Design a protein with these regions (language model features):
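Short consensus segments that form the blades of beta-propeller domains
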Residues: 113-116, 199-201
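Short, surface-exposed charged micro-motifs
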Residues: 122-124
Length: 215
């Protein structure tokens, strides 16, 4: 009987080479991720120091997602939490007060006097630090009719996301809110709905409403 021959060095070398290539590639990719994460973090810090909190938040979000287990990843998460609170306080300060709904188009897009004649009542929202009051006001009698009251609840898909101005209502609808620089126009867009099966994201034909500040 022939004895089994031991694998020769020539047979071992290709296998060793393949393993080394795989390991080297993994190390290189890891180094690239680390370098990219560091660059995003440092850029975020520079925007943070300039008080450009929106750009800083977006960059900290990117840095936190690349390698969340690193010190930079953990530090980015802490900055995200801080910046969300800062930005929410800023937009809430702008939002406090009473707003009149003008429709699904911004102020400059239509003649408000003409569209206003079609309705018997105007729709309003009154925003406080903790609640949103929806009500109607009859144009002739000036009588107010409360539609509903909602708690002001911010929505986060996850802790590391960069969303800070999304709110969720009791029916599960999620609305992105934005206010112009003069703090007199509010725009809300229905971006999703939370159900028992999770969050359904709305990416087209989104319901959109515009408000002007009256008080």
């Amino acid at each position: 009987l022939q004895k089994n021959k031991k694998p020769t060095t020539k047979m071992k070398n290709p296998l060793l080479l393949i393993v080394l290539l795989i390991v080297s590639k993994a190390i290189a990719q890891n180094d690239q991720k680390t370098a990219f994460q560091k660059s995003r973090y440092e850029l975020a810090v520079s925007y943070y120091k300039k008080a450009d909190f929106k750009k800083a938040l977006d960059l900290f979000h990117i840095a936190s997602r690349i390698k969340p287990e690193t010190e930079i990843g953990k530090e980015s998460m802490q900055k995200i939490d801080t910046l969300k609170n800062v930005l929410r306080e800023a937009i809430l300060t702008q939002a406090l007060g009473t707003w009149k709904m003008i429709g699904d188009k911004p102020v400059w897009a239509f003649n408000q006097k003409e569209t206003g004649k079609e309705k018997e009542s105007d729709e309003f929202i009154a925003i406080t630090p903790s609640e949103i009051l929806f009500y109607e006001k009859n144009k002739k009698t000036q009588e107010k009719k409360i539609i509903k009251t909602e708690s002001l609840v911010y929505y986060n898909k996850d802790a590391s996301d960069s969303l800070y101005s999304d709110i969720i209502l009791s029916d599960g609808t999620i609305w992105n809110c934005s206010i112009n620089e003069d703090s007199d126009q509010l725009r809300v867009i229905n971006v999703g709905k939370k159900t028992d099966n999770g969050v359904e994201k709305i990416e087209s034909n989104n319901m959109e409403l515009f408000y002007v500040k009256v008080k």
